[in-house]
């Protein structure tokens, strides 16, 4: 059974990964504006491309910019202050076609825009269409000639999801083959670590809440959601590899919550819709108040699901980065000794926070999966007599 479940899980994960990738690309990647001065905010994380340590009138450290720089999405993966890996920029210009190039092609214009360093405006010329793209740290990306374009570039979050999707599909396929090669035998290696997690989602979440007869129908999605969130959260905890914040990206959590809403709505039975639009045992006059509240609650549930995951995962990163910021602030305002002392304290606190974030990484995956299972159970429960 585990072998068949793992294969369905891998297929469901692949499908969900494609949907999440598309959503993450469209989040903040809308149609280009018609002029450079009215640039739309197509990349919510473009400000992450500059170094906040250079901000301020005299190179002063600005904590807010530093934190946003690390948790926002971007078109590059920043490893150190002076080293980053560029990602593909993909633009579709209406009537001209596609422009594909690496984000490192954007170069500072210099005195033409009167900006240098952190707030320098950069430009790049599309290799296919000849369109000149202007990259403003505050306004996003626009075209110099007013061409209308669509930005479907690979961002840091999209790259992270592609990596996770590839890794988990390979691991799960290997896990399924392991059961096929060694039927009836105890699992070994990585399978020995993953099987308890699969059984946990099945035996402690899906079956007790949804019911044994209906749990298998929703189990592939619940496993997909659980492992995707866990893997995304753990990737975000690895230091010095770009500061991934996948589940803190609203476009990703919107898709996860929307899929939960669609599955709940599609699988809702007569009992579910009856309780929603005509609650039994409620006076007719009271129903005029209850029904709108119930309908509003139907849309509120996935919204809360989305906000809870995004806020909790972003909050952990913000707290850690805030204590990192204190080191620079104390060093800047009170000298190197104060900065060193704060560095020792901040390091100890950040170690504690990392262990706490490790717990939260699994806890948030559990909570999201648990609530999804509860919604599915509410939609499919039979009438009680």
Predicted regions and their residues:
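Cytosolic juxtamembrane amphipathic/interface segments immediately preceding
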Residues: 144-149, 201-215
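Hydrophobic alpha-helical transmembrane segments and adjacent short intramembrane/lumenal linkers
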Residues: 219, 224-238, 251-363, 368-370, ...
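Membrane-interface helix caps and helix-loop-helix hairpins in membrane proteins
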Residues: 239-244
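Selective recognition of hydrophobic, aromatic-rich stretches within alpha-helical transmembrane segments
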Residues: 158-163, 245-257, 261
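Bacterial N-terminal signal peptides
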Residues: 10-20
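Perimembrane topogenic segments of multi-pass inner/organellar membrane proteins
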Residues: 2-5, 21-188
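Hydrophobic transmembrane alpha-helix segments characteristic of membrane transport
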Residues: 170-209, 271
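Membrane-interfacial loop-to-helix junctions in multi-pass inner-membrane proteins
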Residues: 5, 185-189, 210-219
